[in-house]
């Protein structure tokens, strides 16, 4: 086993470990991530080789890079001592490679050219014989430093808290600009409830979306999860009860943009299967239709309530059954708009878990977001199903509420997990009511 240094993003740090665990599991990599610290962007791990390191980090959204670790210490001097102990077994393969040095600081001030040159010159004992190539090096030897911000003046301490030296093995998609590329405002089509780009991509990694997999979002909206799925190679399919959201506006309106335009914009149109207008609680998909992965953000009921087909006005419903237009029952006409009624989110989630238990293959994943009130005295009960193992509960905090990303894995018939139905959750999980009453 070899030591590697992970350089992580300080964005959503409580999601980082779970994302790496999911990617490690996807590629069959055994790695101990128990040293993960949410307050630090650096973590040392042990892997068998560079190929494992590349697979672990390449598509990670909350990691920046991974380095073959050559040495580290509490200051530059101690770091050099450690590198000198290891150099004989590390330098040989790269002695004649074209190279460059990179110096990175976390929370520290960028060093002057003179300071950088001094640090680079201090590595002459490595005996590197290759040419320095700043444009297209074969190897990038990197010094990474972390600093503490002083409370007195909010400036970094003059000296680093710790230093690492390593050889760059792999940059992540984050370092290649994927989060910025999928920024909502850059898309041809988006809406008020469009899910943020960064966590859409993270969610798809936790769902283990892979090349050629069938991905389904039953509450597709403006399609953030499908776009992210297509980026990772999945075939994207979805449904939504809102026809206008799927089509981008009313028929006949000029210059309408819709989800398909976003796929064209990102060059992933070949991964776009289709989206259909459907009430998920009255699913029109075949019973034997298998789905590899389900990723979604069910309607919470803050900006948009939870709607299903139906009506609470029984008199109107009876009238609809008998009304004819041009000799045709009104509910059979193409221009008929199905009435909708509100239901609780818990009602929807039970259907979602049962759907996943029926349709996913063993090992397939269901990932969805669920809101919760930030009430210390009232815990939120998480939906459970006996065939689905809940492996991650990840929280994104807001002011008076939070949302949780729940990650389930479908297990075989021998697994008999816990079931928590909507009847058990209903009293504690009435999120919409508590949100608009300020959780009082």
Spans of model-derived segments:
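Residues that form generic nucleotide/phosphate-binding pockets
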Residues: 23, 79-89, 122, 126, ...
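A short N-terminal interaction module
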Residues: 88-152, 156, 163
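Short amphipathic alpha-helix with an adjacent loop that forms part of the alpha/beta core around
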Residues: 82-93, 283-290
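A broadly used, surface-exposed interaction patch
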Residues: 58, 62-88
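A short, well-structured beta->alpha microelement
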Residues: 29-30, 82, 130-133
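Class I S-adenosyl-L-methionine-dependent methyltransferase catalytic core
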Residues: 1-60, 65, 78, 107-110, ...
């Amino acid at each position: 086993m070899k030591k590697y240094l992970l350089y992580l993003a300080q964005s959503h740090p409580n999601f980082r470990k779970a994302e790496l665990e999911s990617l490690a599991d996807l590629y069959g990599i055994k790695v101990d991530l128990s040293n993960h610290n949410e307050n630090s962007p650096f973590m040392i791990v042990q892997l068998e080789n560079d190929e494992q390191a590349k697979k672990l980090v390449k598509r990670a959204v909350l990691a920046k890079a991974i380095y073959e670790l050559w040495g580290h210490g509490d200051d530059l001097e101690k770091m050099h001592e450690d590198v000198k102990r290891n150099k004989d077994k590390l330098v040989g393969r790269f002695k004649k490679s074209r190279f460059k040095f990179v110096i990175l600081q976390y929370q520290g001030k960028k060093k002057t050219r003179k300071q950088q040159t001094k640090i680079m010159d201090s590595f002459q004992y490595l005996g590197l014989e290759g040419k320095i190539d700043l444009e297209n090096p074969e190897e990038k030897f990197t010094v990474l430093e972390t600093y503490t911000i002083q409370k007195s003046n909010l400036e970094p301490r003059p000296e680093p808290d710790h230093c690492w030296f390593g050889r760059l093995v792999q940059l992540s998609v984050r370092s290649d600009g994927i989060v910025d590329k999928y920024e909502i405002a850059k898309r041809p089509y988006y809406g008020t409830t469009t899910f943020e780009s960064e966590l859409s991509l993270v969610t798809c990694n936790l769902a283990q979306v892979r090349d050629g997999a069938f991905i389904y979002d039953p509450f597709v909206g403006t399609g953030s999860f499908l776009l992210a799925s297509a980026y990772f190679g999945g075939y994207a399919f979805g449904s939504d009860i809102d026809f206008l959201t799927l089509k981008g506006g009313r028929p006949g309106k000029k210059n309408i943009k819709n989800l398909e335009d976003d796929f064209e914009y990102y060059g992933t149109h070949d991964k776009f299967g289709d989206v259909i207008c459907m009430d998920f609680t009255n699913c029109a998909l075949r019973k034997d239709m298998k789905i590899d992965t389900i990723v979604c953000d069910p309607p919470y009921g803050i900006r948009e309530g939870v709607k299903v087909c139906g009506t609470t006005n029984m008199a109107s419903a009876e009238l609809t059954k008998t009304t004819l237009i041009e000799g045709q029952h009104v509910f059979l006409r193409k221009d008929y708009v199905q009435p909708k009624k509100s239901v609780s989110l818990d009602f929807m989630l039970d259907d979602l878990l049962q759907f996943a238990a029926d349709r996913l293959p063993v090992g397939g994943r269901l990932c969805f977001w669920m809101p919760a009130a930030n009430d210390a005295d009232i815990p939120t009960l998480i939906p459970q199903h006996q065939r689905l193992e809940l492996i991650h509960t990840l929280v994104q905090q807001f002011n008076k509420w939070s949302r949780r990303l729940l990650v389930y894995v479908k297990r075989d018939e021998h697994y008999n997990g816990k079931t928590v139905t909507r009847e058990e959750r209903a009293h504690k999980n009435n999120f919409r009511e508590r949100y608009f009453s300020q959780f009082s």
